[in-house]
């Protein structure tokens, strides 16, 4: 199981200068969902992991499972 805090930090870094709202809108979720992922309080569903990876032009493994 991936460490939520590590994944959250990766997601924050990938977001860069984009706002939570910009990312949420692109993914079709709420800003709260993105915030919860980035704070390591929740993990996205497997389907959402695929969308996130595509949005950031990365692989699911590199974001959610790579050590």
Q: What are these model-predicted stretches?
A:
Residues 37, 66:
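Residues in the recognition helix of alpha-helical DNA-binding motifs
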Residues 17-36:
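Short alpha-helical DNA-recognition segment
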Residues 31-35, 42, 61:
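Key DNA-contact positions within bacterial/archaeal DNA-binding proteins
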Residues 12, 21, 50:
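Active-site phosphate/pyrophosphate- and oxyanion-stabilizing loops and adjacent acidic/basic residues
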Residues 14, 46-47:
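Short, Lys/Arg-enriched C-terminal cap helix and immediately downstream tail that follows
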Residues 47-62:
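DNA major-groove recognition helix of helix-turn-helix/homeodomain DNA-binding modules
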Residues 1-17, 65:
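A short, Lys/Arg-rich alpha-helix, primarily the initiator
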